Amino acid sequence: EISACLVGSEMCIRDRGLIDGPSTYNSISNYFHQDLRLNCGSYGFEAPIQVWTQGTAKDIWTCLGPIWRGINSMKKVTIDGEEKLRGGSLVEASYMSAFRLGTYIATQFKPNVAKAIYHMTNAKKVLDTSCGWGDRLAGFFASDAEEYYGCDPNPNTYARYNEQISKYNKLLSKPKKVTIWRCGAEDLPYHKLPQIDCAFTSPPYFSTEEYNKGGELEENQSWFKFNE
């Protein structure tokens, strides 16, 4: 268990540890953002959608090949003195695993971990300065926190946040308050924020993921603005 307390202006942490939450509930935010996430490549590898729509036959086969071979349950067997791979089954996990081998898939932040952070801090008003794929937003709605403030410069995810908020609030007896600005943390109007109980985020991977590359307002992304 991890607990934290604020002493003066310094945060002290007791019982340092790791919040080891499962990825079981990733789908509650991924439902709204998966197509955008699968179109976000990195500096070294293209995203699945990029490979599928723009890649060569060889690029696409790099992904389809493992599916064809049934990557999840292949076994090494000896045939005529030679070791070969045989067997394999085509199950749902095969598809994602295969594309992970041939492309780059932007990672999610586990919503249940965000929920745990808000719970540990007894937060009612939370700040997320990099809303990303809506994972911490999902964690907020599952928590006892009441107000969520955040920002993200990506116009595509910004539009999805509105869908996400509307859908979640329809499931609650009392809608929660959410305010998100379409900008980076460096341009967030901090003077408009109330007293925040918990400021918690997952900053962009500057040297890894290229968010909204080639899209509208690409120039507002951190990897573009602060590229060295």
Stretches found by the model and what they are:
Residues 7, 143, 194:
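Structured loop/turn residues at beta-strand edges in well-structured enzyme cores
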